[in-house]
């Protein structure tokens, strides 16, 4: 059963913020090959706290899935981009190079429903993909009330706190 993620301590996020304030994010990026078996692409993520290694492990596992499932993860719509969370003044995890958005055409996002008071949750991302990301320390935007099913961000401290 899918559950929503709660809050937890933020040592990882504090480290990301410190690096971003110093303007050092770009110097800490690493290019990895995303889903090479399925004709994926090169993406850039941070090396801080092993985000690059975690995403590489995710890529290797998803690359072993059948094409009809892996296609939900191709192409990557974005990783590193210095920006804010839509509608806020908070930096997105994309600004730290610690988030990935998957295939937009296979995703659902609450804002796409217009101005509904209570958006109806929708999802097309296979749970097999979600489980692989979570196994490697990523949280899924599909678990949020204001859902964003294409979005995964590296927040291992939240995964660990949920398991306790």
Predicted ranges, named:
Residues 147-164:
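Basic/polar, cationic surfaces and motifs that engage anionic cell-wall
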């Amino acid at each position: 059963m899918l559950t929503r993620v709660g809050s937890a301590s933020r040592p990882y996020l504090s480290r990301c913020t410190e690096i971003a304030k110093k303007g050092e994010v770009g110097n800490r990026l690493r290019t990895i090959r995303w889903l090479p078996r399925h004709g994926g692409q090169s993406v850039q993520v941070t090396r801080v706290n092993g985000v690059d290694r975690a995403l590489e492990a995710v890529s290797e596992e998803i690359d072993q899935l059948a094409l009809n499932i892996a296609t939900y993860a191709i192409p990557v719509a974005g990783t590193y981009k210095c920006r804010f969370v839509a509608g806020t003044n908070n930096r997105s995890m994309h600004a730290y190079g610690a988030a990935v958005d998957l295939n937009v055409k296979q995703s659902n996002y609450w804002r796409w429903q217009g101005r509904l008071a209570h958006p109806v949750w929708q999802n097309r991302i296979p749970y097999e993909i979600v489980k692989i990301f979570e196994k490697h320390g990523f949280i899924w935007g599909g678990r949020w009330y204001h859902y964003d099913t294409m979005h995964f961000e590296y927040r291992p401290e939240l995964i660990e706190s949920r398991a306790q």
